[in-house]
């Protein structure tokens, strides 16, 4: 999983990158578009990620009409996590990276892998799979350290 940031307008390959990132931050004046329909084309590759982050109707409207949306609308529809001023973009991305890297690294990786696996399962298949993952998480070193740190009222040491 990755984070992406957009300092300008986003379309085509950049849009694919944004839709496939776990976190996406854009400047407030960025525009997002999939204009292929205006050229007699369809954004087939973009759909792989688009419908995983945007509601179906909003995503279909976005690709069927090919009209750009602004960063506020992109945030409202779930295409991005947050829109910020141009001057705050680098600091916001840096703060996010710092926050994520300060969390339990083994558990983060394990959890993201479990997310990927269960994403293609039916609800009834996912529940027993995820129940097993909970047990494995509790057995891991991050859980042991996190619980000990909580009980000892200290910050965890993930090293």
Q: Which residues are covered by each model-predicted region?
A:
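Single conserved hydrophobic/aromatic residue that forms the stacking wall/gate
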Residues: 1-7, 11
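CoA-thioester-processing core
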Residues: 12-63, 92, 96
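Key positions in alpha-helical "signaling/recognition" and NTPase switch elements
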Residues: 17-18, 74, 150
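Well-ordered beta-strand positions
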Residues: 22-23, 61, 65-67, 73, ...
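C-terminal long alpha-helix characteristic of the crotonase
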Residues: 25-30, 80-128, 135, 139-141, ...
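Short acidic/histidine-centered micro-motifs embedded in hydrophobic/aromatic stretches
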Residues: 65, 77, 110-117, 149, ...
């Amino acid at each position: 999983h990755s984070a992406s940031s957009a300092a300008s307008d986003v379309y085509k390959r950049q849009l694919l990158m944004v839709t496939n990132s776990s976190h996406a931050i854009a400047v407030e004046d960025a525009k997002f578009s999939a204009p292929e329909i205006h050229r007699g084309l369809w954004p087939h590759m973009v759909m792989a990620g688009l419908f995983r982050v945007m509601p179906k109707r909003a995503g279909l409207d976005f690709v069927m009409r090919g009209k750009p949306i602004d960063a506020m609308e992109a945030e409202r529809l779930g295409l991005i996590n947050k829109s910020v001023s141009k001057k705050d973009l680098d600091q916001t991305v840096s703060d996010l990276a710092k926050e994520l890297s300060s969390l339990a690294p083994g558990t983060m990786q394990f959890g993201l892998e479990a997310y990927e696996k269960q994403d293609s399962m039916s609800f009834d298949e996912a529940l027993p799979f995820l129940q097993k993952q909970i047990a494995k998480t509790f057995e891991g070193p991050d859980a042991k350290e996190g619980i000990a740190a909580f009980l000892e009222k200290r910050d965890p040491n993930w090293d």
